[in-house]
C-alpha cells in the first residue's frame, strides 16, 4: 500500500508527502553529513518515530483498558555509528509520571509500549534503551 511520495529538492533536501492527509515535511542532511541541519534528517525521523510509535501504542492500550492517559513527553537521543554510517543506538527518555498510575498499571503500559511496530522492526539492528520516569 503506497503511503507517501518523496521528491528530491536539491541541496540534500527532500519533500515528503503523506498521501491520505496531504501533510508534508522537509528533510535535510545533518551538519555532520554535508547538510545544513535545518530540518529533521532521515535518521532523526527514524529515531523520533520510535517515541511517537511507543506513545501511540500506549494510547491504544489505555483506550482499550479504560486507563486515563493525559500526559506524556519524550526526549529522543540518537547515536550514530561509522563504517557503515548508521543509527547505532536510540535512547528514549519518556516521562509518564504525571499520569498517576499505580505500579501495576505502569508496568503494563511500559510492556505495551515495547511492542510498538517501530521497535519490533529495529530491535535486532539498533540498540534501543528506554528511561521511563
Question: What is the predicted function of each stretch?
Answer:
Residues 53-54:
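Alpha-helical metal-binding/catalytic segments enriched in His/Glu/Asp
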Residues 1-48, 59-133:
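Extended beta-strand/beta-hairpin segments
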Amino acid at each position: 500500500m503506497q503511503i507517501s511520495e518523496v521528491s528530491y529538492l536539491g541541496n540534500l533536501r527532500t519533500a515528503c508527502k503523506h498521501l491520505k492527509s496531504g501533510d508534508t515535511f522537509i528533510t535535510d542532511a545533518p551538519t555532520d553529513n554535508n547538510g545544513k541541519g535545518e530540518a529533521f534528517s532521515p535518521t532523526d525521523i527514524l529515531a523520533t518515530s520510535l517515541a511517537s510509535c511507543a506513545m501511540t501504542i500506549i494510547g491504544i492500550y489505555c483506550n482499550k483498558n479504560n486507563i486515563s492517559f493525559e500526559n506524556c513527553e519524550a526526549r529522543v537521543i540518537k547515536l550514530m555509528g561509522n563504517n557503515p554510517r548508521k543509527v547505532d543506538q536510540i535512547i528514549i527518555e519518556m516521562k509518564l509520571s504525571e499520569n498517576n498510575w499505580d505500579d501495576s498499571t505502569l508496568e503494563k503500559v511500559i510492556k505495551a509500549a515495547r511492542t510498538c511496530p517501530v521497535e519490533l522492526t529495529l530491535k535486532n539492528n539498533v540498540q534501543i534503551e528506554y528511561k521511563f520516569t
